[in-house]
Amino acid sequence: MDRHLNRDSAEKILAKKRKLLGRGLSYSEKILFLHEAGRPGEKALIAGRDQIRLYPDRVAMQDATAQMAMLQFMQAQRERTRVEATIHCDHLITADEGAPVDVEKAEGSNREIYDFLSSSAAKYGMGFWGPGSGIIHQVLLENYAAPGGLMIGTDSHTPNAGGLGMLAVGVGGADAAEVMAGLHWEIPFPVLVGVRLSGRLRGWASAKDVIFEMLKRFGVRGGTGRIFEYYGEGAEGLSVTQKATITNMGAEMGTTSSVFVYDESMDAYLRNVGRIEDADYAKTCAEILTQDEICAREPGKVFHEVVEIDLSVIEPTHAGPFTPDRITRVKDFNEVAVREGWPSEISAVLLGSCTNSSYSDLYAAAQVVEEAGNHGLRAKAPFLLSPGSTRIYETIKRDGILDSLVKAGAVILSSACGPCIGQWHRKDIKTGVPNVIFTTFNRNFRARNDGNPETRAFLTSPAVAAALAIAGNTGFNPETDTLEGADGMEFRFSAPQSPPFSEEGLSSFRGNFIPPAEDSVEIEVKIEPQSERIELLPVFERWDGKDFLELPILVKTRGKTTTDHISPGGKWLKYRGHITHISKNLLEGALNAFSGERGRGTNVITGESGVKFFRLAKYYNENTGGFVIIGDENYGEGSSREHAAMSPRFMGAKAVIARSFARIHEANLKKQGILALTFAYHQDYDRIEEHDRVSIVNIAGLTPGKPVKAVIKKRDGSTYEVMLYHALTGEQIEWFKAGSALNAIT
């Protein structure tokens, strides 16, 4: 809750909302209404239809997305950020030799990026967490997340802060820039889903398995446009970092956000990390920071849907490969692996990421490997560990946890994202060789971690991952299987029991952190004139008032098309601040429905085939005035990277027409002035052919809620019409006409 809003004012706002709605309020609604722009309480908003305008308390950016966010903020011509903001350098460090060396290499190879980000942070009054200081979401949880607050972040896993009772939403850089410039932030009023947890986790079951259960039920699209609110006595029994694992991976369901209702575990966590003032403030607002009684008594009157989960029946599970919603119980995995023909040997186990790198997570893993060590066993599989932050690293070092993991064979990587986002210089497996890895990450898309499309990545909990590292075999079940120690004795692992945090408290050492500068008038933002890494953004041209006529189709994608496919990371991360260079990866991983190739298409004008999409886009833009992209279901799933919208815009895309969109990507397309349209009839996707030309007509009549008409011209000259839907508001239509949202405000 915003400290600038006193309790009396908050209660008045909420009382007005209760009267307007004729019922009590959920926790999520309270946070939204207490951050509503304008004069709250005058209109009952319809979920999924109406927009709500909000003023977030905080903006967070990681270094790969902060570059474009800051370049856009600079165009807004403000002297300082209007809200608290931080930049976190966690995405550009490549995992190779280990923590100190990898950070040193990153500081050298990314010097101009770090100079730009640190100088712009200083110039505009933002906090700067330098390379090696921690993964953004763990750092936010430890230092900034607060019950009742509202935060936006330029990373899709920003809802991690929901584990500490904060409503946190992943956005694109344009949203962040506008909020930092003092403007409101607008989203469709979300559909509310209540998740009532009962019971307690048992044995090897973990918070990771709870979110896997949710993914099994809802899939990767079931959360779109929704906020999932977790509550109940089962929720109260989870630690803050367990809660954060669940809210973090709510992003995999496409949610707007996920959040836990404030409880005593949050008070304890805040005090343990040294945030006594925040803990005391939350305690004084405890009556506000909870659901109204109706949520427990008659949840159906508040929530669109109510989900019941008994934690006591949750079992340990794995997710994968290639999608986080393919869930297999650990006890069934060997049978499935044999049937599918997956390799039985584990080629690597990776522990960490923003999802599972807390003290409690690493304590559980250490318990497992210590038990193995007592029998003379070390990890059979290569074992890599990324601590969540400098504070976590110093704490596990102090408490002996680090030593246990290193003795078991763990290589300690920097406190950064590393292999989770493809920043992994992997040397043991050649590209194209089938292999299996287990990770505690949150995503397992094809080729995401190591660039190898034949790597089958499975997600699991830290304790199970540690047991698998020791066993080295994919089918090992730590609940029932035994291992023979070097001492000749057979043993079965004991189920780990880890505390919520260190009793001695979290280390206060923050490492490479620079607080906001108080006097920044004389500070200059550093951009090298001939930089190959940072480039000032062009101003996108305004809509010329004409219809889009007979545009070629750049690609019709088939199946899962994530932002990783549209604008890959890995080797391209270094160009995230250079729109010209980053656009050369356009749709590099997308599967062409016409040819079955990835990243290439046919020039329908010249007849040349196998052309990289960025070259094809350039040709179409220069010779036909642009192009359209056709997408399948949930187009743009995955990370919040706005490059997946900005690059198509830069290369000449006029519209993306899909069966459906992922929330953040659709918002990013709108921000960049691209029409985001969906087929009114899903079967029309199947009718689109490679040589078709697409005309989008009567654009001048574009109106909220009114369908758009497209005319499809076949190769033989015949035509047919297709009805398209859009979700543009009046304000967003003005963005389109202005050429981008940024154009509309500058």
Task: Describe these PLM feature segments.
Residues 1-746:
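Fe-S-dependent hydro-lyases/dehydratases of central metabolism
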